[in-house]
Amino acid sequence: MNIKLTLLVLISIINLMIIQPIQTLAFPIYAQQGYENPREATGRIVCANCHLAQKPIKIEAPKTVLPNSIFEAIVKIPYDTNNKQLLGNGIKGSINTGAVMILPEGFKLAPKNLLSEELREKTKNVYIQPYSTTKDNILLVGPLAGEKNQEIIFPILSPDPSKDKNIHFLKYPIYIGANRGRGQVYPTGDKSNNNPIVSLNTGKVTKIISLEKGGYKIEIEKDNGEIYTENIPQGLNLMVSQGSQVVANQNLTDDPNVGGFGQTEIEIVLQSPSRIKGMIVFFFTVTIAQIFFVLKKKQWEKVQAAEINF
């Protein structure tokens, strides 16, 4: 199983590198490699450690589901499709998306052979994988081309308490984390080029040198007369010019990040079929009783009217 999973991941990565060679920072696999569980004890999903900007996401799923049934959980990752992100080589490219879904124990990705034709069509070309062989209730997907995947459909199979005594007919939480665009920090802790460059010291910009391969070198004279150099990578726009006065931690460039990460949660009820049948019988009985009560009341009113007339 581990070999098959590894091969599938490698094939996915190779395909993505061929199609989108630079868009690698949205890989949820980074969380997979670094954390046994993507949700910390505080409730924070670890993807937020690399994707520092916060952006909204939404999830749509049924309020209740029956055991051993397949349902859709739709994750919505909105963003302006006119925006382009800064890629690793300093050029602008399309934004990608990715998501992690943490299901209750027993819930898992629905096998493809159980999907309806409609659901199979909706989820084609979207590779969703379990977080690990021991955590098949945690699902990962991405990176995906964002233009076509601002909505990601997860086909979920609910558990059956009659087959698993650890599962009960209860209300359960589902946790979702999703990102659009690249992160600002690598798993190693190093910053990516998807950050603004800030001045390390207070001083004056004395020289700006445009580099042949793109980017700049900025020479800044500190208050004590010492000159130091700030290196600006390709793709960032300068916010200072020669002669500008700068202070420590002032942005020398714009912020290239157009993406961000968001997380949310919903609740879903695993409903007992016998309870539903019982409720139907109860409501049917109450309805019949009310009908008989109304008929009896009308009959009594007729008797009363007849006695008055007599």
From Swiss-Prot:
Gene Ontology cellular component terms for the protein in this record: chloroplast thylakoid membrane
Record-linked Pfam families: Apocytochr_F_C, Apocytochr_F_N
What does the entry comment about cofactor binding? Answer: Binds 1 heme group covalently.
Keyword line: Chloroplast, Electron transport, Heme, Iron, Membrane, Metal-binding, Photosynthesis, Plastid, Signal, Thylakoid, Transmembrane, Transmembrane helix, Transport
What Gene Ontology molecular function terms does this protein carry?
A: electron transfer activity; heme binding; iron ion binding
Q: Which family does it belong to?
A: Belongs to the cytochrome f family.
Task: Enumerate the PANTHER family for this protein.
Answer: CYTOCHROME F (PTHR33288:SF10), PTHR33288
Question: What's the name of the protein?
Answer: Cytochrome f
Q: Which organism is it from?
A: Gracilaria tenuistipitata var. liui
